[in-house]
Structure formats: C-alpha cells, structure tokens
Amino acid sequence: SAVAVGWSGYASGLLTGFGIDVPQMLPFGEMAGHALHFNPLAVFIIFAVAGLLILGTRESAWVNSALVVLKIAALILFLVIALPAFDISHFTPFAPFGWGSTPTETGVNTGVMAAAAVMFFAFYGFDAVSTAAEEAKNPGRDLAIGIIGSMVICTLLYMAVGAAAIGAMDFNAFAASGEPIAEIVRSLNQPEAAAIIGGVASIAIPTVILAFLYGQTRIFYV
C-alpha cells in the first residue's frame, strides 16, 4: 500500500501534465475524530498488478524485467542531469537534524536514526526473491545471486541518487514533493527529461507491488 501511494504521486503529476486532473485523495468519512481518505490511483494500480499476475508467471516475469530496465535507465538519466549541477554546500550542515530520532512539533521524527528506519523499509522485499525458488532451475545458485546481487546494485543506486538529489537541490525544496526526482530535474530546466522520468516512474514503480503480490501468492500456497 505504501508503494501504491508513492506511485500515485508520480501518476498524478504525469496526468496533470497532460491536463487530466485526478485527485490523489478523496474524502471517505471520519473515524475517531480523524478524516479518512481514499486514494483512487493507489487502488487502481494494485488491481492492475493483480490482474497481470493472474495472467501467469511467465508473462509477469517478462513485464517485470522490461520495467526494471526502464527504471534503471530513468535513474541513470537523472544522474546524468543532476551530477553536473552538484553543489557540495548543500551537504552543510551534514546532519541538520542530528544523529538521533527527534520528533518535531508536527509529530514527525527527524534525524539520522529516523531516516535509517525509513531506509530499512526501502530494503524490505529482497527476501521475496526466495519465494520464487519453485520456478528456479538451480535455486541454490540462482537465489543467492538474485538476492545478494540485487541488494548490492540497489544500494549503490540508492546512494548515488540520494547524493545527486541533495547535491543538485536543497533538500527542503523537494522534501514534501510527491515526485521528488522529477521535481529536481524540472528545477534544472529539463522539463522533457522530468516528464520522461515521471512517466517511467508511473510505469515502473509497480514492479515493487508485483514482487510483493507474487511473493504473497507463493506464501499462501505453501
């Protein structure tokens, strides 16, 4: 659900660029004094990915591979655009919110430890590769390569994209954005590239949802 909500931010921005206004949140009522909201785009993508999985494993794997290639290409495009605008002064002070986890007046935890908790979530899901053991020809070798290899590649990409993003633009300017990568590229006077990155994100981010749903079906089967 968290990935689906994140995807809806990029999808909403992309649709807005085409003159289509689809709200990310619709009022859904109230519970215990808190307003409830409904995210139509997030619900749509979950059902769309579930429909793809129903078609079969082979079809899902082919689509997933193609989308991962697109996703990596978009990140490389971002690095090519952002790195020339890198400004080391954006890293000063290096840890403006401290090294601990300090709640703000709005209740949001800030600091290195709070960020580490979010990054832990970013690594959640690599174990889903193990649920595909039944389809692997040599699971003892293939699963080790799949899990460790994907973690190494993703870690390097996380570090490179994070450093390039902060170096190209002050983090306060994009921290609250629903499409931060595209927002940074747009601020560098590259609207076409921003549209491409936003479009690829809208298409490729659902691969994460696909991996989770695929793994869940195998867990239920066992």
Predicted regions, residues:
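Loop-to-transmembrane-helix entry motif
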Residues: 63, 150, 203-206
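Non-catalytic, surface-exposed connector residues within folded enzymatic/regulatory domains
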Residues: 1, 5, 63, 146, ...
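Structural signal for the C-terminal ends of transmembrane alpha-helices
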Residues: 51-57, 134
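Hydrophobic transmembrane alpha-helices that form the core helical bundles
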Residues: 1-46, 51, 202-222
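Helix-loop-helix junctions that connect adjacent transmembrane segments
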Residues: 19-44, 69-198
